[in-house]
Amino acid sequence: MRAIWTGSIAFGLVNVPVKVYSATADHDIRFHQVHAKDNGRIRYKRVCEACGEVVDYRDLARAYESGDGQMVAITDDDIASLPEERSREIEVLEFVPAADVDPMMFDRSYFLEPDSKSSKSYVLLAKTLAETDRMAIVHFTLRNKTRLAALRVKDFGKREVMMVHTLLWPDEIRDPDFPVLDQKVEIKPAELKMAGQVVDSMADDFNPDRYHDTYQEQLQELIDTKLEGGQAFTAEDQPRLLDEPEDVSDLLAKLEASVKARSKANSNVPTPP
């Protein structure tokens, strides 16, 4: 893994130097877009609306458009000048019971690795969080965005690792405006009892290893079948028509034009004496 951020956790008067790593990776199969007619790869170009030129990535800039249509350019230097952007500190704001953080607020997860010769301060904070069953609510800047996050320790069996889970801001969570749930619904005791029995019959401890992404597995089987069945092609292959009937009328028109052009050329050749 490659660290995406380095800094330190500000824990009272103690600083805990850490490296930050992405804790998750998407396992979905990725597709390329191709032209259905001949399997040619689709390429997108960045075109300037003002001059019509194709713009290279290195020539791109950012701008913000206000509600009344005015725009201001925001440069990399502008971003770098912000105090929060320059900070390399994960500031602990408070320690809260782990149960207080609603899972709906979780966004992304990151591993924290000690970034010093001694891991004592790291282990001290990790053990404190574990024994108090609390999370630290922290504040830091990552990838040009101010983050509110929950810092906790997770036991991976052979080691305890501190993790940061970035949280959504309150205004990023939508209000579930479902008036139908405001209606009074009568649930009979027998119905509630029966539903409870169903839950009891399916009750178990959560073990994520017993579940698999069956869609991705089936999709991979489909791809493997096509690869092994001679349906594969490479990007260097000459694009080919795929089961599309030839436009005979267009071909005939081209042949007729060729004959006429050849006849005209022959008629202009002087007859030898």
From Swiss-Prot:
Domain of life, per lineage: Bacteria
Cysteine disulfide links: none
Gene3D superfamilies per the UniProt record, alphabetical: 2.40.290.10
InterPro entries reported for this sequence: Ku70/Ku80_beta-barrel_dom (IPR006164), Prok_Ku (IPR009187), SPOC-like_C_dom_sf (IPR016194)
GO CC term (a single one): DNA helicase complex
Domain Ku: 10-193
Keywords: DNA damage, DNA recombination, DNA repair, DNA-binding
Keyword DNA-binding recorded: yes
One GO biological process term: DNA recombination
Pfam families: Ku
Entry keyword DNA-binding: yes
Span list, region Sufficient for interaction with LigD: 111-273
GO molecular function: double-stranded DNA binding; protein homodimerization activity
UniProt subunit comment: Homodimer. Interacts with LigD in the absence of DSBs, and with the isolated Pol domain of LigD in the presence of DNA. Interacts with Sir2, possibly in a trimeric complex with LigD.
Function: With LigD forms a non-homologous end joining (NHEJ) repair enzyme. Binds linear dsDNA with 5'- and 3'-overhangs but not closed circular dsDNA nor ssDNA. One dimer binds for every 30 bp. Recruits and stimulates the ligase activity of LigD but not of T4 ligase or a human ligase complex (LIG4/XRCC4). Attenuates the 3'- to 5'-exonuclease activity of LigD. Stimulates the template-directed addition of dNTPs by LigD on 5'-overhangs and nuclease activity on 3'-overhangs.
Family: Belongs to the prokaryotic Ku family.
The protein's name: Non-homologous end joining protein Ku
